[in-house]
Amino acid sequence: MSSTAFTSSLSNWDLYPTNGSITPHLLLVGAQILFLSGPHFHGRRTLAATTILSLAAIAQYNRFTNNPGVANLFALAWPHWLSAVEKIVFASPEGPEADLWRVDRVPREAMSWPVFGWRKVKWAVTLLLNLRGIRWSFQVKNVPKMPERMTRGQFLRWRLGELVWVLLMTDLVSQMMLRFFFTDAAGALGNLDSKYITIRDARWGWSLLKALTFGLGPYFFINMQYLVVSILAVAMGISRPEVGSCPPRRSNRQPC
């Protein structure tokens, strides 16, 4: 049976078979760190772009899990590997090490570090996680200055409190989504075909509540991921605790 015929034969609630491997996904992560923390050499741009883009394409054809939590981690990896390609391909002739540094450190600090050493690996990982370049030489515009600082302990206590709040709200929104979008008219949970999912309702109040629930789901899930990353990064010393670093258009609860 061809791939197209097989796909069309699936109903909306059927899951694709997990006949792939997690290896390309892990290699994709490793390749980004490898090329950023490795030496600068002729052909680095071409080799890095070819390797990362090839692994990204191969990873798309390797379904290794139907667990939404695990799959979500790798499904959201695309901005990170795109960022790695951009920073290497469009770097100056001396490489990204000459362009990217933390504003409170010595400029071009990574150029003096041993390749694949701990400091350069940590620099590469921090660079990949900090997509908006907060406190880096490539920081995005319109980030407000926040002179107030927190100690590591204060920051971790504050963020852990935020994480508890977000986890509670995530659980509440998840239960609301199950009730609104995955429960049929008879009250059976999980039997509703996804093609019938809609925020429309004959009663405008319920329609508004469904739309709010649909929007709050990604909001709290993404906030939860940012909080966990910020807690781990500060706890391990990869990042420094900062009170504020987000543009005003985003919630002040969301770490960067």
From Swiss-Prot:
Keywords noted in UniProt: Glycoprotein, Membrane, Transmembrane, Transmembrane helix
Protein topology in the membrane: Multi-pass membrane protein
Pathway: Mycotoxin biosynthesis
Record: glycosylation sites: 19
Membrane-spanning intervals of the chain: 21-41, 163-183, 214-234
Gene Ontology cellular component terms for the protein in this record: membrane
The keyword Heme is annotated on this UniProt entry: no
Function in brief: Part of the gene cluster that mediates the biosynthesis of aspirochlorine (or antibiotic A30641), an unusual halogenated spiro compound with distinctive antifungal properties due to selective inhibition of protein biosynthesis, and which is also active against bacteria, viruses, and murine tumor cells. The non-ribosomal peptide synthetase (NRPS) aclP is responsible the formation of the diketopiperazine (DKP) core from the condensation of 2 phenylalanine residues.
Protein name stated in the entry: Aspirochlorine biosynthesis protein F
Source organism phylogeny: Eukaryota, Fungi, Dikarya, Ascomycota, Pezizomycotina
Gene: aclF
